[in-house]
Amino acid sequence: MGKTIPRFLEQLDLIKSFVGLATGAGALYLLYKAVRTGLKCHPPLCSNSPICIARLAIERERHGRDSGEIRRLLNSLDCKQDEYTRSMILHNITRCVYLLEAEASSCTMDDIDLVADMLDEKDNSVKIQALNALKAFSGIRKFRLKIQEHCIKVLELISTIWDLELHVAGLRLLNNLPLPDYVHPQLRRVMPALMEIIQSDCILAQVQAVRLLSYLAQKNDLLYDILNCQVRPNFLNLFQSSQPGSLLFEVLVFAEHLSEGRNATHYRAVKWHYNEQSLHEALFGDESRLADRLLSLVIHPEEEVQIQACKVIVSLQCPQDLGSRPSSCRPSHSCFKTGK
């Protein structure tokens, strides 16, 4: 009897082990079936999930045919939808344009106008998604001229609505387009708003606004308007080493373009007058501390910031038309003064 009980317990442990193995194997099999079923399960083409839209791109590549998804989404914009639905439709159009570029290329100019019409909606989220969709379409060359026609509307939105997400979307669109000369009058009117965005607390909006003004600073007929634009007394805080490297780099490029522009022969041939709180006085005036900020950025941890700071210093010391004659270069009277 004493020997029988231990043997029985051993057999019981063995049975438990077999049961455990069987249970584990069964669970694994059920998990395998669930995963396999999930992989085989294809949501309908009308699904708005990112996975579904990505699958559309793959299917189109595989079978060489249009999914029809962009057309379906554009057609649904014609229907009366609530603001949230319109916003989501535009969001999905944006994703589809990036994923299905060949299919997006078959869209028409009327489709671009349809998307641009959404800029007149009252809800800011609809405006933002419409701007994002236009930005996506602007990557297709044939639509760029058509989208340019709506630049004035975009500038109006940026200057009249204080919504940083809208600013980012609108400025990204403008920075992706060559701006025609006929929008320059509108650009002059929105420059104070652009300066306010540059001095805001939203890094993304600041970077985009500086990038746009840096591009415009290279336009001869806009340079004075930019330099005479009013800025806050603490504008030079944008050149502090504590600022994000991406913003510092763009601000330094902007300063270089302004310095080169004001040193150009045709610009110096005119006697310009600037207001006391202008960007010109903040950067190049007799009381400017830009030189000190630039010197501190020469040892910035990021190499591209260091290089760009050096470029600004060179542009300040050597006027553009004297750059080919080093012996004639002389320090600017506004920065790096003799004896300092």
UniProtKB/Swiss-Prot annotation:
This protein's GO CC annotations: mitochondrial outer membrane; nucleus
One Pfam family it belongs to: Arm_2
Tissue expression summary: Testis-specific.
Membrane topology designation: Peripheral membrane protein
Consequences of knocking out this gene: Knockout male mice are infertile due to asthenozoospermia and abnormal sperm morphology. Mutant animals show no significant abnormalities in the gross appearance of the testis or epididymis compared with controls, but have multiple sperm mid-piece defects such as absent mitochondrial sheath, and scattered or forked axoneme.
Localization (cell): Nucleus; Mitochondrion outer membrane
Location of region: Disordered: 321-340
Region (Interaction with TBC1D15): 1-101
Coiled coil: none
A biological-process GO annotation: positive regulation of cell growth
Compositionally skewed regions (Low complexity) per UniProt: 324-340
Gene3D superfamilies: Leucine-rich Repeat Variant
ARM repeats: 100-139, 179-218, 278-318
Signal peptide boundaries: none
Keyword Acyltransferase part of the UniProt annotation: no
Annotated keywords: Differentiation, Membrane, Mitochondrion, Mitochondrion outer membrane, Nucleus, Repeat, Spermatogenesis
Subunit (UniProt): Interacts with TBC1D15, TBC1D21, GK2 and IMMT. Interacts with VDAC2 and VDAC3 in a TBC1D21-dependent manner. Interacts (via ARM domains) with RBBP4.
Function: Essential for male fertility and sperm mitochondrial sheath formation. Required for proper mitochondrial elongation and coiling along the flagellum during the formation of the mitochondrial sheath. Facilitates the growth and aggressiveness of neuroblastoma cells. Increases the EZH2 activity and H3K27me3 levels in a RBBP4-dependent manner, and facilitates the enrichment of polycomb repressive complex 2 and H3K27me3 on gene promoters, resulting in transcriptional repression of tumor suppressors affecting the proliferation, invasion, and metastasis of tumor cells.
Name assigned to this protein: Armadillo repeat-containing protein 12
Species this chain originates from: Mus musculus
Lineage, opening ranks: Eukaryota, Metazoa, Chordata, Craniata, Vertebrata
Name of the gene: Armc12
